[in-house]
Amino acid sequence: MSYSKIKWAVIFHEKFSLEFDELALEVQDELLSQMVFLEEFGPQLGRPRVDTLKGSSYSNMKELRFQAANGVWRVAFAYDPKRQAILLVSGNKAGVSEKRFYRELIRKADDRFSDYLQSLNED
């Protein structure tokens, strides 16, 4: 008997899709590589690749963590009601105030996720 493993869908928020195109190719490539783990393991994926973002309005807000192009990258994402991981916003936290970095990342992620959830309810 064989069991097929369910893959988790990973999608980009429309604003993040535009930002992704502006990232250095090395960062894009590494993010795409990290997305494979999200697809494979879904919400079971934990540290060091994924951690919960504390301070978000959403208890399921996470950060995908990786290094690329001499940077320390974080990509905020959450699982939506359709059980998809939606990537919301990214940032390089190398060389900046950690408190300020996370405040801005979480603010954008929460705003985008809120807008996204509202658009799902309108469909």
Regions found by a protein language model. Name each.
Residues 1-72, 81-85, 92-123:
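Basic, Lys/Arg-enriched alpha-helical interface segments
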